[in-house]
Amino acid sequence: MSGKGKVHGGKGKSSEAAKSSTSHSARAGLQFPVGRIKRYLKRTAQNKIRVGSKSAIYLTAVLEYLTAEVLELAGNAAKDLKVKRITPRHLQLAIRGDEELDNLIKATIAYGGVLPHINKALLLKVEKKKQK
């Protein structure tokens, strides 16, 4: 070796090609990983069916939108309670407070607590006693 610089061997990308490569997420303008979602789709697909790249992008966009929606509502719930950290309780309040998300997410959230609710029949009996 003459020592005039690095010798690149093999089939690796040159520095110019490495700079121009962009991820699927960056091309789609998403934050969530499109490549990982596509890999999960391929792994869970029945009978080795083909998975199109647009389907992975679409699913990633839907997941990102739903996550942003839940986090925005949970952040508002945390802000209303004057705390800076989102807890499972805030997630529970956000999801159960929105009718569409409540229908979509039927799961029980660990350490989420319950929504405060008093049956109207119980309130009427208390009010009648106060009036007498």
UniProtKB/Swiss-Prot annotation:
Which residues in this protein are found as N-acetylserine?
Answer: S2
**Stretches with biased composition (Basic residues):** 1-11
Any one GO molecular function term: protein heterodimerization activity
Task: Locate the compositionally biased regions of type Low complexity.
Answer: 15-26
Q: Span of the secretion signal?
A: none
GO CC terms of this entry: nucleosome; nucleus
Where does the record place the region Disordered? 1-30
Per UniProt, subcellular location reads as: Nucleus; Chromosome
- Please verify whether the record's keywords include NAD: no
Keyword Nucleus listed: yes
Q: SUPFAM superfamilies annotated for this entry? A: Histone-fold
Q: Which residues carry this modification: N6-acetyllysine?
A: K4, K11, K13
PTM characteristics: Acetylated once deposited into chromatin.
Q: What is its main location?
A: nucleus
For this protein, the record's InterPro entries field holds: Histone-fold, Histone_H2A, Histone_H2A/H2B/H3, Histone_H2A_C, Histone_H2A_CS
Q: Which Pfam families match?
A: Histone (PF00125), Histone_H2A_C (PF16211)
Question: What are the alphabetically sorted keywords of the record?
Answer: Acetylation, Chromosome, DNA-binding, Nucleosome core, Nucleus
Q: State the CDD domains in the record.
A: HFD_H2A
**PROSITE patterns documented for this protein:** HISTONE_H2A
Subunit and interaction comment:
The nucleosome is a histone octamer containing two molecules each of H2A, H2B, H3 and H4 assembled in one H3-H4 heterotetramer and two H2A-H2B heterodimers. The octamer wraps approximately 147 bp of DNA. H2A or its variant H2A.Z forms a heterodimer with H2B. H2A.Z associates with the VPS72/SWC2 subunit of the SWR1 chromatin remodeling complex. Also interacts with RBP1/DNA-directed RNA polymerase II largest subunit.
Q: Which family does it belong to?
A: Belongs to the histone H2A family.
Q: What does this protein do?
A: Variant histone H2A which can replace H2A in some nucleosomes. Nucleosomes wrap and compact DNA into chromatin, limiting DNA accessibility to the cellular machineries which require DNA as a template. Histones thereby play a central role in transcription regulation, DNA repair, DNA replication and chromosomal stability. DNA accessibility is regulated via a complex set of post-translational modifications of histones, also called histone code, and nucleosome remodeling.
Name of this chain's protein? Histone H2A.Z
